[in-house]
Structures are given as C-alpha cells and as structure tokens.
C-alpha cells in the first residue's frame, strides 16, 4: 500500500484531498504546515509528498529543501500544488527539487489521475 504525505494549510482542501486519496486505499498522513510536514517526513517513509506552496512555519519550497537534504528522499516523489502558476514560479519549484506541479484550483479527479500516474510510474 502506497503512503502519501499531504501538507496543505487550507483545512477544507486538505480534507477533500485526504478523502479522495483514502477512498482509493492510499495511506495519507496530513500536515497543516511546513513544520509538521518535515517532522512527519523524518519519521516515516513516503512514496509521494504533496505540498502546498504557501504554508505557515515553512513554505513548500523550504520543505522540499529539507526533504531533499535527507538520504531517505532519493526515491520519494514530490508534487507541488500552487496558485502561483507562472512559468518562472514553476521553474523555481522544479529547481528546488519538486518532481511534479499542479496548479490550483484543481478537481479531485485530476489530482487522483496525476497521483496514480506518478505512483504507477506512468508519468
């Protein structure tokens, strides 16, 4: 069973994403800020980390930097969610270490399709 870490500070969106992923039998750990995300990542192996760009404590970019500096992150895929979808922002996201990007707003179905593609090695 695949394990996913979701870090999103918007409660309603976080619950929607968790429900969508858990309905497909993914194990989802959730964090409401970047600090919680880093703590969870240090204590559990994840197949995928989904991060919001703008969060309290640490931004999504800062979380990526922390994750990519650990030995255990080599096989972990990172998906960044952001309303900042200008090309220069996306370039910065990828340069920091994200593997995938999805612009907000998005439908739960589209997110699920992307997550399944990532975890099945199709994307």
Predicted features by range, described:
Residues 55:
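Receiver (REC) domain active-site loop signature in two-component systems and cognate sites
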Residues 106-115:
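C-terminal output helix
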Residues 8:
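Conserved acidic carboxylate
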Residues 30-48:
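Acidic, metal-coordinating helix/loop segments flanking the phosphotransfer/catalytic sites
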Residues 15-23:
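Charged docking surfaces used in two-component/phosphorelay signaling
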